[in-house]
Amino acid sequence: MLVSPDGLTKLLLKNGAGLALFILHFIFLAVEQDKFNYKDIYLRKIDINKRSIMGDLKHKQAFICDMDGVIYHGNHLLDGAGDFVNWLNSNNKNFLFLTNSSERTPRELSEKLKRLGVDVEESHFYTSALATADFLSLQKPGCSAYVIGEAGLMNALYNAGISMNNVDPDYVVMGETRNYSYEQIERAALLVQKGANLIGTNPDTTGPTEKGMVPATGSLISPIEMAAGVKAYFVGKPNPIMMRRAVRRLGCRSRHTVIIGDRMDTDIVAGIEAELDTVLVLSGVTSMDMVKKFAYRPKYIYSGLAEMLKTM
């Protein structure tokens, strides 16, 4: 027969029993008396964890956020995106939208968000096109390139002092494009065979749209790699070069910065390797089942920005 809590306390003090034994015995006593609810204890533990997560994210100084699959799908703003930007501004957080897409300029991205009802200045955007231009201008100032891509890439390279050259360029640079021809593939492959270095703005093989997944730079550059017999160098996420520049732009230390993304193979691994806290949202290309296939894990997982904001 179990003794009462008071009797047990006196007995333990008298005999010098350990604290662990006291706690264990007390739990067994409470269970017998139907006064101990394991479900309540479990729920309290979850609530404590949620408050801990809220504290971690709420007090970060800087936020790096992907766009496709996090902020929008095509021309559809995702739940919580506008509220998230409002929260960043009202709490004076440093933030940067870091996208592997090279199609649009920062101005075009700002205008797109404005059309969707979210006001963000151009200075808050850093694209793989800008990262590629920065990389090439540091590697070989005044270099030239044969470029396959859209306005975002062309403008970034031009503004970095890189000239266009389709005869004997230093680099062949490939980004996302919707105007892709066999003649471009052929010329690019021949130029690489003659000595031009092959650069890709990002390694993504697919990108999300309202219609579904479509080929991205990693897929588009593949025929050139195969024909020229070389592997491209990719500047965008998860390349540490792009991550270091992003953190430097924010002016914060890694431990005070968090990255939010929808791709395990770019956003999350980039954050882990840069020693940032990582948030995976399941509003883009990654499902919970897919997460299990990777050797690494994000620190936090949410269905989307709307759910994340509930903890902040």
What feature does the model see in each segment?
Residues 2-9, 17-26:
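Intrinsically disordered, low-complexity segments enriched in serine/proline and basic residues
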Residues 14-15, 45-46:
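Polybasic, lysine-rich low-complexity intrinsically disordered segments
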Residues 28, 49-65, 70-79, 83-93, ...:
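Asp-based, Mg2+/Mn2+-dependent phosphohydrolase catalytic module
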Residues 35-41:
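Compositionally biased, low-complexity peptide segments typical
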Residues 101:
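Conserved phosphate/oxyanion-binding catalytic-loop motifs
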